[in-house]
């Protein structure tokens, strides 16, 4: 009888979830169409009408596609992996980052870890050495020290040149993987077409203030909704440096180019003649692959191969330290803007050869982002000058409501806290500000950059990273 009661309760819960999901879907698709009609009626401009229709189509496409996304489950696939952690000025966290990797459940006999200190000016190297001495797996850990700062791409190249095994896992030096993250991250590589996999990022320091919490829920949206959509078609545009995995052979040509900029001790990477004559060494592409934005460059090259797929694993969770000051956040967004530009230009060379849905996702998203500054300026400044205040009000109301829908669907799919809804609505104003300032500046200064994603190396994580893996707030769907 007890079993029957439990079964009945489970059926009621399942029915309730289906009803809730149905209501969210109805609200999402119905309201998006209403928003499009409001935007179209609010302005007589052809460009605004075209943008509104394109944005509506993209949102509907995204929600339909991401609804069918599911991560790969564990089937016992355990390839040999090399975990790479490039670091600069991370004395407060580097030991904990290394420990979380070895505290995971991936077989240590099939895992090697390489940590690169890229010319740190603090005590990062000493922290790496302490982790090596204290680890029972020190024979699986290799430390590399650059006497001066060469940049993240050279740090990656130094390690990948020495990597063993088929799969290379890259982890940022301020990011902490869950116990099962690496095990779940490599599962899609059972498919020989998969060249790269992105993990799912969250903010470990979301309780430090409003800005970190805003970023936490924004990450949930960008990973689960956007990458979930892209993953359906095998065209994830960026494997985040927080946690990403690549087939080593798929990225060797770029690593060869990056290694040339590093220490003379860096071993040459053997490439065949065809690879040496690949597009990485010619024209604009040669400059782009040596620009900031390593994550997008690696992803673009991995995806460029014939039949290549790049996917996302929502169940492979990494928790990163996000900026807790506006200055750090804006610097990060500037670097990401430039990286997006470089990765987008590279993708123009090959995305047209992918499937129609993959090409549509890529080119339409780029079209909408490139036009976004002009659209925001028109709605917020030009339209009011013409006396069409209701048009501006309709634009703001519609944009905020889209933020509401993103927060609601993130809660639905990723099972975040329901507070993701109001926080995502608040983030709309942050997005508008970034579009009018950082994004525009990044468009006209695409070649500047450096190690801009690191905060200041002063974070202490003893209170943020317990000895056991922190309890998941999310339950990957």
Language-model segments: residues:
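Membrane-interface alpha-helices
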Residues: 315, 444-471
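Non-transmembrane catalytic domains and loops of membrane-associated enzymes and transporters
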Residues: 75-351, 474-476
